[in-house]
């Protein structure tokens, strides 16, 4: 027969299990804020999209356990009342509310929630090029807040420059060496082009294999996040 202490232990274990399940099934809050002097049309997969004038914010709740997700900013957009239109950079199939990834060049805030080791993984990426400065800011002050604050467009070489952004070398030249694929999938080094990005934004991914200095973690369930354009 179970004793009172046995029942108490079972009750505590049950409450812990329920709490962990609720935490995993809950949502993580992201707040996107535009501090740029121009309008940014924020986008997220998941999330959709929202026009943000200077100083405006957009709250987005993302299910815990979401993997391979991203936020980005679009510029030079024009949409009609139905939410159809075009953007100069970051366009997502001509939709205000994005259901697909944005076109290059685009600065990305990438993340995975509740990944390996019960950690959130996040990074600022210039692998798809650069269009808007941004930062990822965990509300947990013990976790690092990576940022790309520089105007990379000002340092963009002519071969990579487009209206409103700076393409990656992979996008422009489509070689295995620049794209870290084929014969270079396991042997990919920084290029003179990716080093321009790295020098401007040391905390951001500058090419596909730039993991060691550009991926950050925070214990899952301990934080929400803000994404700031022009931090």
From Swiss-Prot:
Annotated coiled-coil segments of the chain: none
Keyword Ribonucleoprotein: no
The keyword Signal is assigned to this record: yes
GO biological process assignments: defense response
PANTHER family per the UniProt record, alphabetical: OS03G0233200 PROTEIN (PTHR31048)
Keywords: Allergen, Disulfide bond, Pathogenesis-related protein, Plant defense, Signal, Stress response
Signal sequence bounds: 1-27
Name of the featured protein: Pathogenesis-related thaumatin-like protein 3.7
UniProt function note: May be involved in disease resistance.
Domain of life where this protein originates: Eukaryota
Pfam entry (one): Thaumatin
Organism of derivation: Cryptomeria japonica
Family: Belongs to the thaumatin family.
Disulfide bonds: 36-230, 77-87, 92-98, 143-218, 148-201, 156-166, 170-179, 180-188
Listed PROSITE patterns: THAUMATIN_1 (PS00316), THAUMATIN_2 (PS51367)
InterPro entries referenced in this protein's UniProt entry, alphabetically: Osmotin/thaumatin-like_sf, Thaumatin, Thaumatin_CS
């Amino acid at each position: 027969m179970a004793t009172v202490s046995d029942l108490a232990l079972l009750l505590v274990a049950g409450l812990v299990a329920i709490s962990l399940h609720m935490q995993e099934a809950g949502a993580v809050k992201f707040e996107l804020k535009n501090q740029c002097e121009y309008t940014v049309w924020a986008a997220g997969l998941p999330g959709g999209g929202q026009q943000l004038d200077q100083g405006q914010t957009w709250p987005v709740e993302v299910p815990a356990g979401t993997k391979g997700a991203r936020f980005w900013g679009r510029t030079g957009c024009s949409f009609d009342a139905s939410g159809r239109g075009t953007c100069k950079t970051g366009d997502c199939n001509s939709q205000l509310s994005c259901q697909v990834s944005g076109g290059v060049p685009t600065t990305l805030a990438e993340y995975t929630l509740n990944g390996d080791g019960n950690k959130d993984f996040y990074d600022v990426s210039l692998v798809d090029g650069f269009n808007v400065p941004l930062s990822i800011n965990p509300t947990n002050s013990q976790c690092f807040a990576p940022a790309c604050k520089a105007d990379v467009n000002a340092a963009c070489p002519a071969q990579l420059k487009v209206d409103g952004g700076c393409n990656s070398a992979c996008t422009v030249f489509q070689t295995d060496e620049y794209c870290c694929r084929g014969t270079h999938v396991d042997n990919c080094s920084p290029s003179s082009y990716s080093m321009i990005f790295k020098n401007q934004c040391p905390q951001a991914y500058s090419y596909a294999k730039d993991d060691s200095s550009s991926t950050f973690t925070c214990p899952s369930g301990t934080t929400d996040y803000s994404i700031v354009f022009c931090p």
